[in-house]
Amino acid sequence: MTKTTQLIPWYRHLNRAQWRAFSAAWLGYLLDGFDFVLIALVLTEIQDEFGLTTIQAASLISAAFISRWFGGLMLGAMGDRYGRRLAMISSIVLFSVGTLACGLAPGYTTLFIARLVIGIGMAGEYGASATYVIESWPKALRNKASGFLISGFSVGAVVAAFVYSLVVPVWGWRALFFIGILPIVFALWLRKNIPEAHDWEARRSEKTPVRTMVDILYRGEHRVINIVLTLLASVSLWLCFTGELNSAVIVAALGLVCAAIFISFMVQSSGPRWPTGVTLMVIVLFAFLYSWPIQALLPTYLKTELAYEPATVARVLFFSGFGAAVGCCVGGFLGDWLGTRRAYVYSLLASQVLIIPVFAIGGANVWVLGLLLFFQQMLGQGISGILPKLIGGYFDTDQRAAGLGFTYNVGALGGALAPVLGALIAERLHLGAALCSLSFGLTFVVVLLIGLDMPSRVQRWLRPEALRTHDATDGKPLSGAQAVSGRKRGLVKSKS
C-alpha cells in the first residue's frame, strides 16, 4: 500500500461485492462448526435410542474424518476447474443434506453414511471457501480475510451448544439436526449472487489448460492404481477409527499405509513441488496434535479432575470457544501487520506462557481459569485462522483449492489421533498434566516448522529446480528460500 492508502481504514478498501462474498463464506463456516459439534452434543441420546456400544457411538464422530481427505481433494479440484463459487455451493449442499439425513436416520448404518457425507462437505467447505475469500480480497488484507472467515467455525460451535440447551430437552435430538439445515436457504441465496474469485477469473482468462488433482490422479495413466489406493485408504481409516481392530500394531501399520498413499497422491499431483506439499501436511498434522487434545478432552478434565458441575463446565467452555473465535480475528490483524509466518510464531510463543498456568491453577477460581483459557485459546488456537492463508500461498491458482483442501484435511487426521494420545499419556499422568505436556511440547514443533519456513527449505533440499521464491498469494519473498543468483542456490533472509 502507498502512504495515501494506508491512511484509509482497512475496511474501506473493500467493496460491497467483497463483503457479500465474505458473508456467504462466513455463514458457511458457521454452519460447518454448528454441524460438526452436533453429533458430539447428542451422542448419548443417540446411543440410548439405537442401543449402540461405546465404540459404535464414537465411530459416528470419526466417520467425518474418514471422508474428509477425499472431500478436500474432489471439491477442491472442482473449485480449481469450474470456479470457487460452484465448489462452495456444492460443499454446503452436501453437509446440509448429510445433516438432514442424520435427523431422519432410522439406525446406525444410515447415520454413519450421513456422517461420511458431512465429512466430504465440510472438507470442501474449508478448501473452497477459504480460497474464495482470500482470492477475492485485496492482497494486503488477506490475513484478515482468512482469520475472520475461520472465526465462523468457533461461533458455530458456540451457537450449537446454546441451541442444544434450548431444543433437545423439549423436542429431542432429531430436532437439532433439522434446525441445522435452516440457514442453508440464506447461504445458497448469497452464493448465487456473489462474483467469482478475482485470482481464479484472472487465471481462467489466460486460457491455458488446467490439470486438477482429479485429472492427474483419476484420469491419468495411473488411474486404476489410484482408485485402488483410494479404496484401500478409506477402508484402512474405517478400520482404524471405528474400533474394529484391537491390535495397536495393526492400527499403526494401517496408519503408515494411509500416510504412504497420501504422500503418493501429493507426489503425483504436485510434480517436482511435492516436498512443499508433504511438509505442509506435516505442519497441519502437528497443528492438530497440539490443539485438539485440549479441544476434545477439556470437558472431561473439567468434570473429572476439577469436579465442576455441568453449568460450570459450560461456562468455562464458553470462555474457551469465544477466545478461539476472537483469536482468529486478532490473528488476521497480526498477520497483515507482521506477516503471516511471523504472526503465527509470535502468537504461539505467547500462548506457551499461559498453557502451564491453565492446568496448574486448579478449580478454586472459575473466573480466573476462564480468563486464562480465553487468552490461551485466543493466542494458541485462534491463530490457526490464518492457516488457510499460510497454506494457500504455497500453491499456484490452478491447484490452490485442491491443494489447500487435500493438505489440510489429510493433516486434520491428527485431530482424530490427538485425543487418543492425550488419553494414553493420562494413564501415567493426571489428565491435566497430559494435556499441558502435549500442547506445550508439540506447539514448539509447529513454531519451528513455520518459523523456519520448512516447506520452502525442504523443497530446496530435495528438488531445488522447482523452488519458488515468492508467495503465490501475495507475491512476497519466502524467507529462507530465496534463490541466490548463479548456479548455486542458498538461503537469503527477507522481510516477508
Curated annotation (Swiss-Prot):
Entry GO terms, CC: plasma membrane
Molecular function GO labels: carboxylic acid transmembrane transporter activity; sialic acid:proton symporter activity
Cross-referenced InterPro entries: MFS, MFS_dom, MFS_trans_sf, SA_transporter
Subcellular location: Cell inner membrane
Function of the protein: Catalyzes the proton-dependent transport of sialic acid.
Bilayer-crossing regions: 22-42, 58-78, 86-106, 116-136, 148-168, 170-190, 224-244, 247-267, 278-298, 316-336, 353-375, 406-426, 431-451
Protein name: Sialic acid transporter NanT
Ranges of biased composition (kind: Basic residues): 486-496
Family to which this protein belongs: Belongs to the major facilitator superfamily. Sialate:H(+) symporter (SHS) (TC 2.A.1.12) family.
Membrane topology: Multi-pass membrane protein
Keywords: Cell inner membrane, Cell membrane, Membrane, Sugar transport, Transmembrane, Transmembrane helix, Transport
Positions of the UniProt region annotated as Disordered: 472-496
Keyword Transmembrane: yes
Catalyzed reactions: N-acetylneuraminate(in) + H(+)(in) = N-acetylneuraminate(out) + H(+)(out)
